[in-house]
């Protein structure tokens, strides 16, 4: 079906699939995106996603005002990811693999794990916004460049609608 950015998806009876790795800001605005085959592990797409940031990123600083945080899930809990994010100057918030957290009272959970308040729902919401576009939900494009162009158009549309700059 596609070029190198598709691969067999084991949960979909070996049909080709595409995985989107998305980096968003705190409001859900997309700032970096990359694609690969559906059978590719998330951790291996981290560097490409960080390299595809399309806006000018201020240099990280020791002051609290310029620190840049990144929230990831347990799928990124590998030493290579820690080193990469340290190289890029991010303050990492990640849940450790094999550690269960209290799913009950939110106040109690925050008190127990103050540095693990990863807000993954922001990224999931942006993926949901992207899935409103049928062209992305069902991949019809055979060429990777065409699919990436549509992804960038959708990211621009989301930024336009969420930004409120033009009314």
Language-model features: where?
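Compositionally biased, low-complexity segments enriched in small residues
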Residues: 5-7, 11, 111, 139-142, ...
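Helix-centered, glycine/charged polyanion-binding patches within enzymatic domains
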Residues: 58-143
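Charged phosphate-binding loop/patch that engages nucleotide di/tri-phosphates or the phosphate backbone
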Residues: 150-167
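Generic structural signal for secondary-structure transition and capping sites
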Residues: 55-58, 135, 158, 162
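Polybasic low-complexity intrinsically disordered regions
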Residues: 1-91, 96-97, 154
């Amino acid at each position: 079906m596609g070029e190198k950015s598709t691969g067999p998806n084991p949960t979909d009876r070996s049909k080709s699939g595409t995985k989107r790795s998305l980096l968003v800001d705190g409001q859900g605005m997309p700032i970096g995106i990359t694609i690969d085959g559906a059978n590719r592990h998330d951790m291996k797409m981290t560097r490409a996603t960080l390299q595809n940031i399309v806006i000018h990123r201020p240099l990280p600083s020791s002051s609290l005002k310029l620190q840049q945080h990144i929230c990831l899930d347990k799928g990124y809990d590998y030493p290579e990811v820690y080193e990469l994010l340290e190289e890029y100057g991010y303050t990492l918030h990640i849940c450790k693999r094999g550690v269960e957290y209290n799913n009950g009272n939110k106040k109690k959970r925050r008190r127990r794990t103050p540095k693990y308040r990863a807000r993954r729902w922001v990224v999931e919401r942006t993926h949901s916004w992207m899935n409103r576009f049928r062209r992305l939900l069902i991949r019809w494009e055979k060429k990777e460049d065409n699919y990436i162009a549509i992804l960038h158009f959708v990211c621009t549309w989301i930024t336009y609608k969420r930004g409120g700059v033009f009314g």
